Structure formats: C-alpha cells, structure tokens
C-alpha cells in the first residue's frame, strides 16, 4: 500500500524522490513528472501545451553546444532534394556575382577596355537581371525550406521547462472591495411603507436611516430629484460614452464619470460605467454610486439591468442595493 502512495513520473514511471516538478494544471497522477523527462519529451514532440488541461507550458528553447550539434539531420527525400537545389542556387549566385564583379572591374572599367559602350550597356542589363533572378530565387527557396530549417532546429535545440505558475482566478475587484454609497435621494413616489429595519430610503424606516427618507436628507447632503423631462432625456443616451445627465439645478451635484445606453425598463432606468475602477449608476428618480478601490483596467461601458441580470457582461462583480434587497448586479470583465 505504501508503494502505491509513492509519486511516480508519468513519463518514465519511476519514483520522483526530491525531483517533484509541476508543469501544468493537471492534478493527481498526471501532476507528478521529472523535469528532465518532460524537457526531453517536449524537445522530441515539440508540443507547446498540455494535451489534457490545455495549459501552455512555461518553456524556453536553447541551442545545443557546437560540439553536440548535428550538421546533417535525417531528412526525407523531398527535403533532401530541396537542400541540394538550394546549395546549387547558392553556388550559382556566388559564382555569378564574382564573375560579374571581375568583368566590371577589369574589362569594362579598366584602363584599356576590351569592349565598346554598347556591349558594356548590354552587360550591365544582363548583370542586373541576373542578380534579380538570384535574389528572388534564393527568397523563394528560403520560403520553401522553412520546414527543413525547422527540422534542423529541432535536432540542434532543446526545450527547458519551468514550473507552472497559475494565474489568479479571483476577480480584479472583489465584492468586499466595493463601497455602496447613496449620493442622491430617491423620489417620494417610489418608497412605500416598509417593516422595521427596512433599508434607507423607505417612508417609515427606522431611526437613523440614511439620507433619502421622507423627512429629508441629512444636513449637507445634496438634494436632486429628476423631473419627467429629465427622465425622458435619460432615455436618449444612445451612444456609450456620452456624459451623464446633469441639468444644473444643483451645482453641488456632479454627474457620474461616463454614461451608457439608458435602458427603458418601466420605472427603472439605469446608466452605469466601469471607468478605471469607478462605477456609477443613476435611475430616473435617484442616483447611486459604487466605488471600487481597485483602480485597474481600461474603461469599459456596461448597463445595469434589474433582477441581477448582467447588462454589459464585463468582469468583476459589484452590486447596487435598492431598498432592502439587491435589485441590480453589475458584472464586468
């Protein structure tokens, strides 16, 4: 029974000992492997990812020492033929370049030229076309011989593998990093009588309710109620990126950072954004803001839908509370 509990390498089936190494996200028996065995297997197979969990290996390709290199790897018939033609064209190009240079220096450009100007012009034209043929021919064969070069590199290189470093799966902005803050009170027409302990904003809420109760906001809290015209104007935000609505009736009220499409969901109209870690939402008769401490990520625009439905489908999770229940959820990547 003890022998079965000893971890063994899934490649060579030998005990790991102190050479235990994890290279991918596999667990169980497939987690145990020798680093040298995996390096040899990746060098031969040239795989870049685990075929089971799909994790890309953390590897590095290095060239073997010069004394260990193989000058002529084992090639197929087609690869050998292409190699012979390539060597022939290389030799032809080098010989032609040497001959053209010699003619140009000693026959055409010498002190006593042996050809006239017409023959020299013809020679120049031939030299230009010959060099173009050699250059384009070499380029074509270089393109055709990519797999030959890969075969040579596969024989003379080896793969070094490094430990697996899993990426964090937790969202960038966790729920505990979200602050919920009511920045504008709700209207009187939306709150009804509620039981004791109702959330701030109910008509008959408990003592010490937050600003937004019927009795009025706390001292110093900005008061701003949207009229029917402003609610209708809120539905006119067609393009994401337009600034949110602020009709200027209260200079102390600042609009949210960026506005999105305003969804007409009956009495619930929201527009929200996640911009550098800040989330702002505004309804037809009140406004809320959600501040995220994690100032990370590019600007992403989202819509907030009621009943916890993700509007924009973007990243980390935050919630916007209305009354005593969670009526909206913000999901953004």
Swiss-Prot record:
Topology within the bilayer: Multi-pass membrane protein
Cytoplasmic topological domain: 1-82, 143-333
Pfam families, sorted: RINGv
Listed GO MF terms: transferase activity; zinc ion binding
Gene Ontology annotations of biological process type: endocytosis involved in viral entry into host cell; protein ubiquitination; symbiont-mediated perturbation of host ubiquitin-like protein modification; symbiont-mediated suppression of host adaptive immune response; symbiont-mediated suppression of host innate immune response; symbiont-mediated suppression of host type I interferon-mediated signaling pathway; ubiquitin-dependent protein catabolic process
EC number: 2.3.2.36
Known catalytic reactions: [E2 ubiquitin-conjugating enzyme]-S-ubiquitinyl-L-cysteine + [acceptor protein]-L-cysteine = [E2 ubiquitin-conjugating enzyme]-L-cysteine + [acceptor protein]-S-ubiquitinyl-L-cysteine
CDD domains: RING_CH-C4HC3_MARCH
SS bond list: none
Biased composition (Basic and acidic residues): 235-252
Pathway it works in: Protein modification; protein ubiquitination
InterPro entries with a match to the protein in the record: Znf_RING-CH, Znf_RING/FYVE/PHD
Ligand binding (Zn(2+) 1): 9, 12, 34, 37
Assembly and interaction partners: Binds human MHC-I and CD1D.
Additional remarks: Specific for HLA-A, HLA-B, HLA-C and HLA-E alleles.
Protein name: E3 ubiquitin-protein ligase MIR1
Organism for this UniProt entry: Human herpesvirus 8 type P (isolate GK18) (HHV-8)
Taxonomic lineage: Viruses, Duplodnaviria, Heunggongvirae, Peploviricota, Herviviricetes
